Structure formats: C-alpha cells, structure tokens
Amino acid sequence: MIDDGYTVKERGAVAANEAFFNEKTTQKYADVSPHVKYASLRRLYGRLVKDVYAYAHKHAEVPTVLDLGAGEGSATLPFLESGARVVAVDVSESQLSELRKKCGAFNERLEIRLVDIDGAFRPGEHYDVVLMSSCLHHIPDYISVIQSAAEILSPKGQFFSFQDPIRYDTMDRPSYWFNRIVYFSWRAFQGDFFGGLSRTLRRARGVYLDDCAADNTEYHVVRNGVDQNEIVSMLSSRGFECRTVRYFSTQGSLFQPLGAVLGIENTFSIIARR
C-alpha cells in the first residue's frame, strides 16, 4: 500500500521493498541478515532491549512498542517476551506471516498491521517505545520518519534503532576499506556478479535509477549509509538524551569474528530517551 503523498523516490523504495520481501526472501532472511544470523549480534540486541524495556517499565506497567518495519519478528519477539504490548508494522505480507508464527504465543499483546510506515502513525496513538530494527536504510527520508515517531512518543518515551550502516564518509579509513572488501568478497558469490558490478560502477558515478529495484530496496546501503550524527543532532534538539552504539556486522561468516576482534565499526544503534 503506497501513500499518494509520496515522492517518486519514496514510492520506488516502498514498492521495491514490498516486492523484494516476498516468501522466497523471507525463507532465507536469517542467512543474509547479520543481526539475525550471528549469536553475538543477537546477544547485543538482547542487552539493548533489556535496557530499553527496563526504562520503559519504570514509567508504564505494560510498555507499548510500535515496531516499524517489523519484518519477520526477530526484533519484535524479545519485547513481547519482556512483557510489552507491541504493534508490528510492515509492508510485506510474507514477513508478517512469519512474525505471526514466531510471536504467536503472545497474541494477546500483539497487533499486526500490513501498512507502510507512513500509515502506521494514527491520530491519538502514543507509545513508550518506537523501534526500527534494520529499517532506516530502506527509507529515503528517514529523518522525517524519525521526527514523526518522536511526536507519538509518551513523555518518557524512547526511540530505538538497530542495525543500520554508519554513514560511510564518517568511518575511519581502515574501517571503510575493511567494510568494502568484506562486502564485495561476500557479494561475489551471491549470483548476478556482472550485473552487480555494472550497478556498482554506475553508482560510483552518482547515477541511481528510480525504477531499479536494486537501487531502492537497500536504499542507503548502496548510497552513503545512514547519517547517525544527523539523527542524534535532530533528536537532541527535541530534548532527547542519545546513546549511539557502534559495532561490526557483515553477511560473510568468515569475516564477522575477524571484524569484531579488530574493532571495526560499520553499523550503529541509537537509543534516545527523554
């Protein structure tokens, strides 16, 4: 479902993600998603969820969570297990079907909405936590979405993002080049090698196509990453205290432990609270 008020870029991104996250992609999602694939990143996420939930629970007996871009439920489940009430939103029917199965034990505290993110913000609704896990990099204008999310938070509400690529031109050189090398080492074995190479060379010239699904699904991954500093600046100006957690993640199993040991940082999480 695509909002009539979207720009061409936003329409392209929503349509690309809706088409990409089909049943086939859902079945292999864990194999290509580092935050789901690796126990170390699942543990990191679990620790952050514990922190976010503990703060929310101080101010609400049953904290309410709006999970934007909820996907197949890996990020949703820990909040339900902690005792929160969750509204899970996504554009992919296949992903939400998997979420429904994964989180079925908590149906009494789970509401699922098959809408795009813009349709998730309903008049009169407020939440103790807005969660966006592996989501911001899919959205062309993620700053506006976060601004809208901040407006529906309760007085002691929190914004919590996880698993988005650090803006590439803010990375130190060793991290930047290590990140590029390990990505292309993994990508070379994923099929359509020459098509991928052609798209990479085109993007290096600053050329992106509105009708190319590969340019729009992982929107900011194939551009310059997500600007973590701009997000913190915007939220701080609205009275939030922000904590940024930087860490390493990659699809390639051989490189994940190496990057972590070397202290490479290419991915971030933000917890912002009033």
Question: For each predicted feature, which ranges?
Answer:
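A short glycine-rich, Lys/Arg-flanked "PGG" loop and its adjoining helix->strand segment in the class I
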Residues: I143-P155
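Short alpha-helix
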Residues: V222-G239, V245
